[in-house]
């Protein structure tokens, strides 16, 4: 009887050693996700991993390493990876979460994982490694420059006042003879009585307050351009707060965004800002010409740039001639000490 038991154990060991163990890694599947693809600098991001054994045999020895995106910081750890030693029964999973932060604006490619499985006796091991697909975009920080905040606050306040004064976007600019085609509600009975014939109101459909956020990337140092992105975010958050629709224009790799507002609109723009390599591809003069071509009523302009040159200020003066309101210019000045 004991002999049969020993023979059975030896046979089981041989099967595990030479049949099951070499194939174990093929039956381990990793599923993973991040709780966000767009984050603030320093925001806590959670990675969730699920390692699943889809085989009818147990996997008795697993070393499992998960590397977070390069530059990630895991609170309380010096390393940016998690290590686990475990075994998995048939059709069971190992699930866990890792929280980490990313320090600054940019695109962070997802990390990688490494799986090591071994034989029953510890003589051999097999290693599988692969990249974790996807990326996380970190948006710019909010601008904390007091002079910028003060100028911006005053200008946004002026827009709010104008909206209050002209709350109804339909204004009556005169009166015309009734032709029979106008709706009855447009007839002005008061002016009809004065004229002795039917008169209708002639209305001007004005446009509600709207804005263009214009980013100049044709000039400036890297630090000035980084600060310009921070100013763009700050301006757009203030416009969102006031429910003012805004268009975004740039002459760089950030690209453009059609007029709108709301979370989806804001997230699209923040993703563009986060992914920027700070390249400019057209002149400031070309950017201003586009603003002039696409001008519309009740439009406010926010020009964000590194300190403007004389030529750039001349281009800005051309836009001012077409604008109903004073243009808000926010220049990203960087102290040399901060740049160093």
Language-model segments: residues:
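Low-complexity, intrinsically disordered regions enriched in charged/polar residues
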Residues: 169, 260-267
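An amphipathic, basic-hydrophobic helix/alpha-beta surface used to engage anionic
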Residues: 12-258
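Von Willebrand factor type A / integrin I
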Residues: 1-29, 46, 263-264, 270-340
